Amino acid sequence: MAVVISSNGNSKSFDAKMTVYVFICVIIAAVGGLIFGYDIGISGGVTAMDDFLKEFFPSVYERKKHAHENNYCKYDNQFLQLFTSSLYLAALVASFFASATCSKLGRRPTMQLASIFFLIGVGLAAGAVNIYMLIIGRILLGFGVGFGNQAVPLFLSEIAPARLRGGLNIVFQLMVTIGILIANIVNYFTSSIHPYGWRIALGGAGIPALILLFGSLLICETPTSLIERNKTKEGKETLKKIRGVEDVDEEYESIVHACDIARQVKDPYTKLMKPASRPPFVIGMLLQFFQQFTGINAIMFYAPVLFQTVGFGNDAALLSAVVTGTINVLSTFVGIFLVDKTGRRFLLLQSSVHMLICQLVIGIILAKDLDVTGTLARPQALVVVIFVCVYVMGFAWSWGPLGWLIPSETFPLETRTEGFALAVSCNMFFTFVIAQAFLSMLCAMKSGIFFFFSGWIVVMGLFALFFVPETKGVSIDDMRDSVWKLHWYWKRFMLEEDEHDVEKRTD
């Protein structure tokens, strides 16, 4: 799973330096992404550990031990899936509260609340003595994810110099992938620590949570948030501090003007339903759906379990997950380099073909060579791992970051916070659906699960081809005239809004 906020697209160039202080702020705030990534990666490894299964899911452990057991069904357990998915359901709910907290209290206090939720959740999960304590811990971690994923990207977007905003915001996505990789490495080493290795693995999230909590005391609130809450003098002083220059009048006035426009919209959620807001709203929500139905989080959540299913031993499965995590990190750098060179549409279309081929190859190998009680021969198992890695590469430079980048740059200012909150909630909902259903789907559909995701990749590729316009280099202020009004389908909604405005003025 992936989160990115773009530059605000404003064509004006304000005088600003990339200061050491801004760099420190970016790194500290982006630790929120590392925690999110760690939580994504840690659950699959922990659910593959025998000590964890014996403690909380003895029936799954007994099923796993029997060689004659159905390979695809040995991990099928609703409570086991709830251990992973409960975090994302909680994050969905929390994101609505976090949106209000960001507006009323600011970005920094919201990050601090996120870190407190993380710490309490880590303590409960790592120290759990029964399934209920374990799930409650995961739910509190989910609250941390909901608050962190709302506040951190907004913070990064508002504190970065305009010319560097896109790249600095992808640091959040980069930290997510690094968090996944660290979790995979931790899983690999703690799996051999009996009987409490799983407690160490779950407790590891407490370290970055502490860094975020105490590090947030060193960073400032964003100028936009301060001005939005009528702290204009403090906002201007903060702007001078983060830009490293004294003359910030032009950018300051731009922020004040943007905040004034935003205040005029009394009900942003109603505004989102207007015809002119429909294109970014529909695209933003569908991109979240499609991002999850690429199947990426099914692979990232359950990589160790998946590799065990195709015949790898426990340690080898965890090591294979480390390899995929490394590929994920490195491929994110490719996305940073390509997104403003090749454009958004090219990456979406290229990766759709790329991921489709990988899913089909994996599905064909499993359907042909893996029966329900056997294992894959070593060559076929290695081919599966290779194509999983190639698949992860394609996602990491396309549907991962772009699933968030495109909505962030197409929502107009007056509905951006609310639109983004809905995008976060939508993403968390479908992440929950996949996390809760994947192991049951794997049991019911067997290798067909990969053909299922292949079908959705075809649908999303066609959607990108016909309905996602290119937004590279287009100012947000010009999005309506330069993108939506020129698009073969979306222009009808712009015309409808224009006609409504004319009728309103006439009346």
From Swiss-Prot:
Output the CDD domains linked to this UniProt entry: MFS_STP
Q: Which residues cross the membrane?
A: 22-42, 79-99, 116-136, 139-159, 166-186, 200-220, 281-301, 319-339, 346-366, 382-402, 419-439, 448-468
Give the lineage.
Answer: Eukaryota, Viridiplantae, Streptophyta, Embryophyta, Tracheophyta
Q: Which residues form a coiled coil?
A: none
Q: Which residues form the signal peptide?
A: none
Question: What name is this protein filed under?
Answer: Sugar transport protein 8
Q: Which family does it belong to?
A: Belongs to the major facilitator superfamily. Sugar transporter (TC 2.A.1.1) family.
Q: Look up the domain of life of the source.
A: Eukaryota
Reply yes or no: does the keyword Transmembrane apply: yes
